Amino acid sequence: MGSMRKMSSSFKRGSIKSSTSGSQKGQKAWIEKTFCKRECIFVIPSTKDPNRCCCGQLTNQHIPPLPSGAPSTTGEDTKQADTQSGKWSVSKHTQSYPTDSYGILEFQGGGYSNKAMYIRVSYDTKPDSLLHLMVKDWQLELPKLLISVHGGLQSFEMQPKLKQVFGKGLIKAAMTTGAWIFTGGVSTGVVSHVGDALKDHSSKSRGRLCAIGIAPWGMVENKEDLIGKDVTRVYQTMSNPLSKLSVLNNSHTHFILADNGTLGKYGAEVKLRRQLEKHISLQKINTRLGQGVPVVGLVVEGGPNVVSIVLEYLKEDPPVPVVVCDGSGRASDILSFAHKYCDEGGVINESLRDQLLVTIQKTFNYSKSQSYQLFAIIMECMKKKELVTVFRMGSEGQQDVEMAILTALLKGTNASAPDQLSLALAWNRVDIARSQIFVFGPHWPPLGSLAPPVDTKATEKEKKPPTATTKGRGKGKGKKKGKVKEEVEEETDPRKLELLNWVNALEQAMLDALVLDRVDFVKLLIENGVNMQHFLTIPRLEELYNTRLGPPNTLHLLVRDVKKSNLPPDYHISLIDIGLVLEYLMGGAYRCNYTRKSFRTLYNNLFGPKRPKALKLLGMEDDEPPAKGKKKKKKKKEEEIDIDVDDPAVSRFQYPFHELMVWAVLMKRQKMAVFLWQRGEECMAKALVACKLYKAMAHESSESELVDDISQDLDNNSKDFGQLAVELLDQSYKHDEQVAMKLLTYELKNWSNSTCLKLAVAAKHRDFIAHTCSQMLLTDMWMGRLRMRKNPGLKVIMGILIPPTILFLEFRTYDDFSYQTSKENEDGKEKEEENVDANADAGSRKGDEENEHKKQRSIPIGTKICEFYNAPIVKFWFYTISYLGYLLLFNYVILVRMDGWPSPQEWIVISYIVSLALEKIREILMSEPGKLSQKIKVWLQEYWNITDLVAISMFMVGAILRLQSQPYMGYGRVIYCVDIILWYIRVLDIFGVNKYLGPYVMMIGKMMIDMLYFVVIMLVVLMSFGVARQAILHPEEKPSWKLARNIFYMPYWMIYGEVFADQIDLYAMEINPPCGENLYDEEGKRLPPCIPGAWLTPALMACYLLVANILLVNLLIAVFNNTFFEVKSISNQVWKFQRYQLIMTFHDRPVLPPPMIILSHIYIIIMRLSGRCRKKREGDQEERDRGLKLFLSDEELKKLHEFEEQCVQEHFREKEDEQQSSSDERIRVTSERVENMSMRLEEINERENFMKTSLQTVDLRLSQLEELSGRMVSALENLAGIDRSDLIQARSRASSECEATYLLRQSSINSADGYSLYRYHFNGEELLFEEPALSTSPGTAFRKKTYSFRVKDEDAKSHLDQPSNLHHTPGPSPPATPGRSRLALEGPLSTELRPGSDPGISAGEFDPRADFKSTEAAPSLNAAGVTGTQLTVESTDSHPLRESKLVRYYPGDPNTYKTMKSRSFVYTEGRKLVRGLSNWSAEYSSIMDQAWNATEWRCQVQRITRSRSTDIPYIVSEAASQDELEDEHRGSLLDPQISRSALTVSDRPEKENLLSVKPHQTLGFPCLRSRSLHGRPRSAEPAPSKLDRAGHASSTSNLAVMSVVPEGQNTQQEKRSAETEC
């Protein structure tokens, strides 16, 4: 960290020095000063090329050394250079220069252009400088994981399925954890596969992963294009096939090019890369988590150097876990094999040890000593087997590479469970935490699985203040205050102490998950035993409010607005500040618990006296009425004494999910808020509170001119919570109507003693109020105890006007009420029971149908009258009738002549207004808020209250003036006349009770607001015309207030159609006098001069009327129309919402209307005074609200909460079922099932292929046994003395040199089921290397295999009886095409053979990695006058799981043969040429028919069908050989005098004489790569469309074609065969 500070300070100094380009130029100077390149300055000629230096560059490309001194060297390198002065070294022969290559790359040549940042640095650059560059200049965030990919440098093929799984897993691991990927950078080997995965990801998603390529500068193709300082360079990704250099991979985002002065050599990047990885691992993931950045190595394929890298990783301190991708080839497969069969200590049994040594030798073409060295390194790696994780595609427990990487990190680092949890939390991988950490579920983990040391925790516990964490530990076992000492004694138990540490780790993880907004982790931790009531304390909640992590929020701005002062950036937000913010956002009479006196006292005791001083500045020291003398002070002292700061329960919350949900809402964490809303009690109230808070925050953000998206997002969040509240209400209403109504009206002690209905009204949630449950509740409340179904208004009016009709109305009992408080219910029930008991003795009951009438009769007359007048509907009509009477009297007063003293009618009006004013004062004083100022503020938020205030104030002023003498009495009367307008407008409030008129009242209010904006626009147009017109027509006006009137007077009336035609043009009308300069009228009087510009007035007026009358007025109409339809669509909800306000208003009003309401006021005062006296005597609590509120006991409240939680669970269960039954979900599930089925089918196909291969192996072994038995029979015949000449024609057999020891059973690649293949393996002594190219070729070389057969000419002129061999003969003869070899059968025609001659068949096998030429063998014998002919069959040799290319047969020119009869020869690749079709069992093959007559022999190609097993050499049975001998013998007896040489052989042109073998369709893996631990991988080459099936090249026999032809003809035949296209 010190070096980081030095770099940052040097960077600052550079930026200060640059005065022209600021920080960019300073950063550029810092880069050039810090980073260097390396150049070779001494030429040491190479032994291979004298024109080239040992560094790889040409001698003329070197630059001279700096004159300042010798090149920079370091200690160890210098000593090495001195001791080995003859060798070239980086330290001695290179010099450092400031880097000249850094900037931005633009890749060209691909499908699309990517950009990447790059820099050329020296191989010994300090890693802290590189990290500073990456974080500060490249603007990269520190990773939470570092994946270092290692593998083969040369290009190799991966199985398509494995490549897909590898790419997806790597990308997913990097995406979900925010990882960096380190690779070699150049587009070869494993880097190309990583680049393909990155390319697929970047094409499917917008963001690019951070892939950093660390490549050697000397191996980069086109590196000259990169030279430049802070430049943007175009880079071509097309590589030169003749160059040894490699291009950079265009899928990477950053490149670090390590330079050690060499060219064309790897190794410069190894040390730099390892040091940089080590330095990054020392960095912390974030400030909250103490974990360093974890590093993991990913091995794909690779050579011996990869094994050394793995060992280096495992020996690091701390060790780096390694993930090996099995099935990718070479080093990865060897490591996987060793990991599978090694014991924990790195011990392997002898048989597997020998097999592994042979595998290493064959794979890397190593000698025995080299293979032993590499084997030792592998065994050293296996000593730390637990750090190596092998990914096998398809194996159980490993779905993808991503899980293997993250699991390896958790297990390999040997970290404790809390540290592993921190890593999983940093990666945001809840699946890893669930499967690897919480393996025991909610149960406690076993002893020893939790690793944090005890001592450090204990010391921290002693040093830390009494924070939430330490308090949490105290309550972890549920102890009380008096048992603290016992708790300390119990901590000596290691098990309990370990569990206590685990609890603390879980709580810390919960805090981190909340801060980092990890909803899934919060859910996981709650499921696994985190007690939220134990977890959440006051300090922790404050820490959550003050966090800077997570999504951005506007809480700081809200606190600043509430405190009305500028806050410092590091201001610590307290819970009391949060309480003020909540009260500000909720509005109305809402009172937060954080601002109550009890909480402030607790807060003061916990945190000292500093923060309450801030409360006094805010005026929050006391919200209750002033204290009464000494008693209040004593109570306050007692409260302070009772609070025990050391008790952990004091600083905790009763409902922690309430507090956390409010925190999530204020911090704008919607997903977290929704999750916390589901947990805990009072879900409906929480949803309504969140809806109100979000809506208020959206309003604040829109007024603060923040980004519109913020306000829109907050508004959407508000709608989401509002919808949740409605859905929950609907769910509970479906289950139980009565309990649902209780949910709406019960008292919410945690939410300012409010109710759900009040919270919905505060949030203006119309849909909630318009719900059926809410409306039923309001209807019950509106009707009181009256039971009226039809014409309730008419019945109520009749009851008011004719009181005796009240006795005929129906009333309800208290059992039918759904809104009354429990106290009122009990009182009413007691009264009814008393009445029933009193009337019970009067008579007996007659039947069930009379019960209702008896109940009605049981209600006394006084109760009926009282309940009638207390019903809100009766109060409404009573007040309405009274108000209409008042308006009639007011009309009469102002319409008739007003005397000096008020008339009786006027006194009634005055008394009405005065009593109404007293009622408004009563409303203010009896409202919910505590402070008088807050009461007035809340009261003024209602529009009609403002109207009443203005109207009453005007009337009072008018009444005072009216009582005075003239002229003040006249002024008072005028005020009366204006004031009655407001009282008429007040009638609109009465219309709100009507379903049809109510929405229109709201429309009028909205249209008035729209019209205010329109008036502003109209004012601009009106003034522009009015001022111009007035100035033109009246240029000589004197200053006067009439000017302002004249500006607006005429233009305003023109809007309504009054155009003042006589004043449009002053001189066009006859009524206006003429004017002119130096002109006189008829009487000789001088005319007045004309007003200049008067002709402009008509034109201006035309434009004005066009804009004002047509444009603006129609615009206003359109706005009104839009408002109308907007309100009309929600008219039902609007009316129901207004109905609530009306019902609540009349529910709380006294029974008598003004002016008789003064009697009700006197009654209320008397009851209040008597109630206070009774309280003093009995010590009762405060009087509870008389509103729509239900007071429940603790037991009833608990049952109600349980019902609400059940409804929440049922609601989400229904939503989940609905989502699963949706079409999109069904399509997704079907797609997953189809994909799983396809994978299963692929596995079945692989198993079937394995079974086929196994059957082939069995067939091969059987054929070998059969051949051995044939040899034994032959040996026995020789021993028995049977004549050898009789058996010459019988059979020719190919000998098999493959013994049983060469058949090794190996595990199939990428298979978890242990599939096996049996393959041929040959000793090294059997390999024939006759060319240097072949001897240096790694992998499987040509295998020598001898096949013996016999050729005999039955003619007396030529007779041959000797074996021939199948062997590879390299030479300069005409080449065969790659992938083919030629099989030549030659036979001498001379009866005199040279000693040691070996006529036979020449064949060449090929290796796909080695270039070679296989040619025909030269004729073995050439006698004078006699030449030999040859039958050439060209074929492709292959191994198991290889595709065969083409098989052709090239006969020579027509020859004369002498033969006996027709015979069919069957040839297939990998099988003998046999006669007959008796034992043939292949799938596809060809038949070469030879038709004989006296003069010619013709060849014909046909196709036959065979069943299976094309890859096993077919061995002729003894029975078939015997039949062949008999046919030969019978043929010779038919015409013994005719020799074969006398017959003519001619080609059949229509058949083209081709021997074609079709490809094998079902057997093997045609697209996969065949691998063996004992050989190099063999990749399947693309076969042409004409190419045929896969098969084995094995042996040939029974080829006997002899002729006597001229020598020239034979040469011509060879020429044609060589020129033929293969």
Swiss-Prot record:
What kind of membrane protein is this, topologically? Multi-pass membrane protein
Q: Name one Pfam family in it.
A: TRPM2
- Record text on activity regulation: Inhibited by extracellular zinc ions. Inhibited by intracellular Mg(2+). Activated by the neuroactive steroid pregnenolone sulfate. Negatively regulated by activation of GRM6 receptors in the ON-bipolar cells.
Q: Which reaction does it catalyse?
A: Ca(2+)(in) = Ca(2+)(out); Mg(2+)(in) = Mg(2+)(out); Mn(2+)(in) = Mn(2+)(out); Ni(2+)(in) = Ni(2+)(out)
Annotated GO molecular function terms are: calcium channel activity; monoatomic cation channel activity; monoatomic ion channel activity
What subunit structure does UniProt give?
Answer: Homodimer. Interacts with TRPM3; the interaction results in the formation of a heteromultimeric cation channel complex that are functionally different from the homomeric channels. Interacts with GPR179. Associates with both guanine nucleotide-binding proteins G(o) and beta-gamma G protein dimer; implicated in directly regulating TRPM1 channel open-state.
Q: What is the name of the protein in this document?
A: Transient receptor potential cation channel subfamily M member 1
Question: What organism is recorded for this protein?
Answer: Mus musculus (Mouse)
